[in-house]
Amino acid sequence: MTDTPGNPGGSTQAAHPCGSGPSDGSVPAIHAIIPAGGAGTRLWPLSRRHRPKFLLDLTGAGHSLLQDTVERLAPVTATTTVVTGVAHIAAVADQLPQVPRENLLAEPSPRDSMAAIGLAAAVIAHRHGRDAVVGSFAADHTVADRTAFAGAVRQAALLAEQGWVVTIGIEATGPSTAFGYIHAGDPTDVPGAPDGRRVLGFTEKPDADTAAAYLATGDYRWNAGMFVVRAGVLLDHLAELRPQLAAGIDAIAAAWDVPEREEVLAERWPALEKIAIDHAIAEPVAAAGGVATVPVSMGWNDVGGFDALTELVAPRSEGPAAGAGVLDSVDSADGADGADGAETVDGSVPEAPRADVRVVGSDGALIASTSGRTVVLLGVPGAVVVDTPDALLVTTPEHSQGVKGVVDALRAAGREDLL
């Protein structure tokens, strides 16, 4: 049974956090969990299975989205744990030399976010205790206002100490149909967390009219999938709501730091239920009154497609590509694969050649090139052109969400070499 403040030994159906817990009034540093998975198919052909978007520099800042996430979390974290696929563990280690190798958890196959986050939380609970506050943050989002982000996370940590499952709610900039929504209710009245509000429920991606109606109330925020919670609270909720999944995760976590890890992983991991943390924990616990949100405006971008990327890459102000946004190198300074994954004789990855990009009458266009070819845009304002050594994509921001369908069609046609 889930043991929550105000409901010791009680069930999720009666979970009402109300102010007990280990807090001494100080803000706890969280143990960050970064799930780094997925192929980022909406950013094909830049993002591929062997080189997914979280390993790429998609903002022109000289570091990958993953590196940016770790750097952003540093002021509020005690430890950082990254969960990624076995195919990417070496690249992740190369990009994050500051993260201890034992904090990089390799999952044998994708089992969705609950398995990844649950495993990390269970390993952290074994290493640091069940009262450790954990926070899960995607590896491939960007945040412009780091001060606002850190403030929201600190408030969330104080709420989590009191037994809440906390989600960071993004102040919506418009009635988007691309995101889920959080319905916020009354204040939580937790000292040190003045913005905390009870969550009345979660809604999947609505249609445009419904999204506009939500925003008109002032009580809805975008759901960015960021969760902060005590490790023990998360695992207790999981044990009650998904007991088989919880048992499998617990068995794997118990063996993680002992020689039997691989044997237990091989036996238990493939049988874990594939389910998102939203469905496994957030929605049912919110229905029982146990979820809070901290709303924040922080310039968040999920980098979910080329339409989102056009908002991140500023147009050049001078030179032959003036007026257009240009990404002429997407490999971060450390660790990302080269354009074709080839290595030199000394084992290093060669730098992709810089593109020669020229723009005429094409203001607002976005050009991403890793081929080294000369790319010229003439009279196509707002176009999106992605030129790689083996694939060329031309689209517009308005149609860019359809890229995933293109990838699905290529897979159906047997073009695995392009994915």
Positions of the model-derived regions?
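Conserved N-terminal catalytic core of the sugar/cofactor nucleotidyltransferase
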Residues: 2-34, 41-49, 54, 59-148, ...
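A residue-level structural signature of the nucleotidyltransferase/glycosyltransferase Rossmann-like core
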Residues: 81, 134, 226-227, 274, ...
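A short acidic, often aromatic-flanked loop/helix-cap motif at beta-alpha or helix-coil junctions
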Residues: 110-115, 174-176, 208-210, 300-301
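Left-handed beta-helix
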Residues: 2-29, 232-419
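Conserved core of the sugar-phosphate nucleotidyltransferase
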Residues: 146-268, 372, 397
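Short coil/turn connectors at secondary-structure junctions
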Residues: 28-30, 77-78, 100-101, 129-132, ...
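Conserved beta-strand scaffold positions in the cores of enzyme catalytic domains, especially
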Residues: 55, 104, 165-167, 290-293
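Residue-level signal for inorganic ion chemistry
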Residues: 66, 120, 140, 182, ...
